[in-house]
Every structure is written in C-alpha cells, then in structure tokens.
C-alpha cells in the first residue's frame, strides 16, 4: 500500500467527534486550513524520507497535533509580559508604559467620536495637531508644534521639507545608527538631500561647519548621541555656538534630540539629559524628539519650533502620510497634561515613577518575590536578593546606571537554568529577564505590578 494513501483526508478528520469539536471551538475554516497544511507536510515528508510522519501513525495523534497547532495559532502574539530586564524603556518590550490618564483618554477615543479635527468654539474644521501644539508651546516655550508617528518620521519630514536637493551639514560624530541598522545617512538619502560630514568621529570644531557652508546649504543639523557616548580626547559644538554661526548665513539649525526630556531628570536624582526647553532657549529653530521614551507617552515623533517652519511642515504631502491617529493623539495629550502639574509628575507618569522608585521599596518587592519563588522551585536552585544596576533604555543615557534590586537564581546542575528560562517564557504572562554571571537576574526596577508578577509565579 502506498504511504500516501495512509494520509487521512480532510473530510475524514472533520467527521470524527474530535474534528467536529475542534470545528465548533476554532471554526471550520481554521481547522480545514491546519488539516491541509499538516497533510501537505506529510506528503513532503514521504517524498523526502520515504516514510510516514509520526503524527500520521494514528488518527488520534493527527487530531492531537491539529489541536496543538490550532491553540498555537489562536494565541495572541503581542501579549503582556513582565519586564524584569533592568531596562525600563525596553524597545523590544514596547518602551514607555502609558499613564492611567493616557490609557483612559485612549480608551475614550476608541469608543467615542472625538473632536479630532473640529474646533468646538468656532464650530468648524481645525487641524488635528492644534490642541497638542498649544500644550507643547505652553510646556516648551516654542511657537508651534507638529506631530507624526515616530521620531525617525519627524527627521524625515524636516529633511524632505527643507533640504530636498540641498545639503545638510552634520558632524561625523553624530551620524548615529539606531535599532535595526537604521541610520541618519539613510534617512537623508530617502529625503533627497545631500549629507555633508564635517569634523572627525571624536572632534568637531565650529570652523569645520563654517568651511562647509555654501549657497546650497539648507541647514545645520545636530543629533543628540543618546544611544552611545564618545569619551576621552573629544570636542563638539553646542547648539548655542551653531546657532550663532548659522545666523551669520541666515540658516536654520535643527536638532534631533531623540529621547526628548521635558523636565530636568537631575532633580529626581537621575542622570542629566538635555531638555527640549534648553535647546529652544539656545535658539534652535526646529527640535524633534520621541513621545514614547523619556516623555513617557505613546509612540510619536514631536517637532517643536518656529511657527513659520512648522507651518511648512504641516503643508508638506508627507505630513498626511506620517500623521497620528486619534488614539495616539488622545494618549499624547493626556500625557502632556500631566506635565502641567510638575509637583505630581513622579506619581502619575508611569515611566518617571519606575525610574524614581526608592531602592527600599524595590527591596521589599524582592523579598516577596523570593518568598514565592522558594515555594515553587526545587532545591536544585538557589534564590537570593542582590543589589543590581538598571538602565533607562531606548538610547537614553547609555553609560548611566540607576541603583536597583534583583532576585537572582542560580544552579549547579547543567541545563537547569535554561530550562527555567523556558518555563518563565511559557507562562501565561511571560517573564522576560536577563542572564548574567551564570545567574538569572529578575531586576525589579522596570516592574509595573508586583502583585501581578506574584500571581504569575504561582503558575510556574
């Protein structure tokens, strides 16, 4: 008998009681698709190996495999996880957690019509950035603002609007690459402008910019090196110095600030990060930054600056392609409104709350976590509380660390650590941590909810 004839038909699988149950639970179409894929795999296996795929030895095995694949297919992939990596703004885990106010505003915008492009006072159409622009001007001192879907888009829009077919002067030490091999020179190429590099990797002087300026120069650009740091024999030009030079030639200065802090983090005992207000005070015409990093809101690219320049950005065709939807704008507005009460910011802005949690509070959480872990793990594992260092993440202050506390897990038995990591990731709400010095580190600095974590551990 041919091996191919041993493969069950889709109809035969569907007519079994188990097949009928699966069709009722997952839907007829989904079950048929999985059956078809599995049978095709069986044919390929026979063709290549000249034997039957093990799951086709018995129809009950086949149906069990179909159910497993249906469960895997139906599982939500962008699922909630516990961030115990010690990186608060973890790009791979979604960066900033939204505040309660931002979540509420976003949910309201999802379920209701909102005055997105409608002026309630005038009773007519308005611009969707209008309300947020007013807030940003109030917070930064700038004349106007423009909102797009991320900071790379903000840089692209600025370049395409003001520098297409022209030259942009930038220091070699600021030709950054962010995640995914995404580079400033690549953005410039897409915007249709010519990159003019000045200075060297570690030293750039004001005279380097001066010598590069010509009749085809569109503007001078500064990029905040937020995701790396050059130390030692270095020299760079400040925005204030660059603005003074640019004004001699009637040129603008534009700054990609990256993380985009709106408050001085040093007042909270955190590493100093340049603020948007500082750059505006230095005379920079356009400043771009992210919404989902130190700002603590949704992903967005924010541009603040002089009204005449912002108006041109708003009318560029790319702006419509890059604009944000009502949910993001609602979340961003609610986030920015928290900054109007700076004395309460560390309580209500989730990102700042996580960054400023006292070490004593983290130690209390660590004791709770250690206690639960000791009840769930075998004696093959050692569980200890250890001082740790966390980082902000998302390219913010790469050399700076923040004191933290971690629960560490170690074992002398081969393969046990890897097995536990797999168990952590297989939990209903996976635990994402780090491995360092042959130990699992569960760093509590970036954890949003200790009670939720403890409930998850109980399912280990």
UniProtKB/Swiss-Prot annotation:
Keywords: Cytoplasm, Protein biosynthesis, Pyridoxal phosphate, Selenium, Transferase. SUPFAM superfamilies: PLP-dependent transferases. Its EC number is 2.9.1.1. It catalyses: L-seryl-tRNA(Sec) + selenophosphate + H(+) = L-selenocysteinyl-tRNA(Sec) + phosphate. The modification N6-(pyridoxal phosphate)lysine is found at residue 293. GO terms for cellular component: cytoplasm. It is found in: Cytoplasm. Disulfide bonds: none annotated. Its main location: cytoplasm. One of its GO terms (biological process) is conversion of seryl-tRNAsec to selenocys-tRNAsec. Pathway: Aminoacyl-tRNA biosynthesis; selenocysteinyl-tRNA(Sec) biosynthesis; selenocysteinyl-tRNA(Sec) from L-seryl-tRNA(Sec) (bacterial route): step 1/1. One of its GO terms (molecular function) is L-seryl-tRNA(Sec) selenium transferase activity. It is an enzyme of class 2 (transferase). It comes from the Bacteria. Its cofactor is pyridoxal 5'-phosphate. Converts seryl-tRNA(Sec) to selenocysteinyl-tRNA(Sec) required for selenoprotein biosynthesis. Belongs to the SelA family. This is L-seryl-tRNA(Sec) selenium transferase.
